[in-house]
Curated annotation (Swiss-Prot):
Record function comment: Performs an essential role in the oxidative function of the citric acid cycle. Also binds RNA; specifically to the 5'-untranslated leaders of mitochondrial mRNAs.
The protein's name: Isocitrate dehydrogenase [NAD] subunit 1, mitochondrial
Name of the gene encoding the protein in the UniProt record: idh1
Source species taxonomy: Eukaryota, Fungi, Dikarya, Ascomycota, Taphrinomycotina
Keywords (A to Z) from UniProt: Magnesium, Manganese, Metal-binding, Mitochondrion, NAD, Oxidoreductase, RNA-binding, Transit peptide, Tricarboxylic acid cycle
Annotated positions binding Mg(2+): 224
Family statement: Belongs to the isocitrate and isopropylmalate dehydrogenases family.
Subcellular location: Mitochondrion
Length: 356
């Protein structure tokens, strides 16, 4: 179950011509091109009323002016279209490398809320059953503020920024999501026992916001305890809200519970824009070009996008076909224990759509 939260903004008006929505497509680096191709092929076969405006952004080229220009073009495209679908862009480790293009997109457009859905796929056996929770992560501050400097040789200071305004905004998003999607509780994940000012502010603001939502139970957990609880008893979780870094870590832990990063959908929301991408944000460089990529995360993220645009019937068809192929177990990619290629898996979904 998923209901978008951006439509309540009067500023959000997706671009639509001739009965079709125009959506920005950023294939991404690594396996992004392969998984994006799977989505576009499925959309074409299903006659989904979407026209993609493709912008080829890459983070692979160090300090390349054309990469920066492409990023700017992508931002302008998203400002026009209001909705985007993207793969993950590579971020270099080296000091001289560019900052994360993924983070830059979210900050420039103030796409402040990340949503990752952690849920068992019917018929696909994992260690835990009945896992179904949402991770909501603040996208624009915390440890991802990008404010670092070397004060003296051998000493680096990295600033973690937490503000009351953005803490309140993400908490409201989490409670609104819970309310609109039939969830019962929202848990604040923090480290306020150590970071008493920063995470203390985040936790305190969370409980202030909770006072306005009588139907939802507020809880909180220290992040290390939450990580342990996630792998031991994930069924207790419903909606989790947290600063940026904790969200990155728990999203990856969550993915391992239900099949890995290849099956986790994600979305990012701001007041005016929505950007959909795989929930675990893995580039997959080690398997690029080998035809082994699992496109499920990209496909399910695209289904979230369709629901966001009000195209529920198309989303239901594609979602059902994807789940059906996985449940059948005959055509699975390598990460799910099979030997099918990305193309084989995609074509199995296309065939299943015809029979549904």
């Amino acid at each position: 179950m998923f209901k978008s939260l951006v439509r309540k903004s009067s500023a959000f008006q997706p671009l639509k011509y001739g009965g079709k929505y125009t959506v920005t497509l950023i294939p991404g680096d690594g396996i992004g091109r392969e998984t994006s191709n799977a989505v576009t092929e499925i959309f074409k076969t299903a006659n989904v009323p979407i026209e993609f405006e493709e912008i080829d952004v890459t983070g692979m080229e160090k300090n390349n002016k054309s990469s920066g220009d492409a990023l700017h073009e992508a931002i302008q495209s998203l400002k026009r279209n209001k909705v985007g679908l993207k793969g993950i862009l590579f971020t270099p480790f080296e000091k001289g490398g560019h900052t994360s293009f993924n983070v830059a997109l979210r900050k420039e457009l103030d796409i402040y809320a990340s949503l990752v859905l952690i849920k068992n796929i019917p018929g696909f056996k994992t260690r835990h059953d009945n896992v179904d929770f949402a991770i909501i992560r603040e996208n624009t501050e915390g440890e991802y503020s990008g404010l670092e400097h070397q004060s003296v040789p051998g000493v680096v200071e990295s600033l973690k920024i937490i503000t009351e305004y953005k803490s309140k905004r993400i908490a409201q998003f989490a409670f609104d999501f819970a309310l609109q999607n039939g969830r019962k509780s929202v848990t604040c994940i923090h480290k306020a026992n150590i970071m008493k000012l920063a995470d203390g502010l985040f936790r305190r603001t969370f409980y202030d916001v909770a006072n306005g939502y009588d139907a939802i139970t507020p809880k909180d957990l220290i992040v290390d305890n939450a990580s342990m609880q996630a792998v031991s008893r994930p069924q207790q979780f419903d909606v989790l809200v947290m600063p940026n870094l904790y969200g990155s870590i728990l999203s990856n832990i969550g993915s391992a519970l239900v099949g890995g990063p290849g099956v986790i959908p994600g979305a990012n929301f701001g007041r005016d824009y929505a950007l959909f991408e795989p929930g675990c944000r893995h580039v997959g460089l080690s398997i690029t070009g080998r035809g082994e990529a699992n496109p499920t995360a990209a496909i399910l993220s695209a289904c979230l996008m369709l629901r966001h645009l009000g195209l529920k019937d198309y989303a239901d068809l594609i979602n059902a076909a994807t789940y059906s192929v996985i449940e059948e177990g005959k055509t699975l990619t390598k990460d799910l224990g099979g030997s099918a290629s990305t193309g084989d898996f995609t074509h199995a979904i296309l065939e299943r759509m015809e029979s549904l």
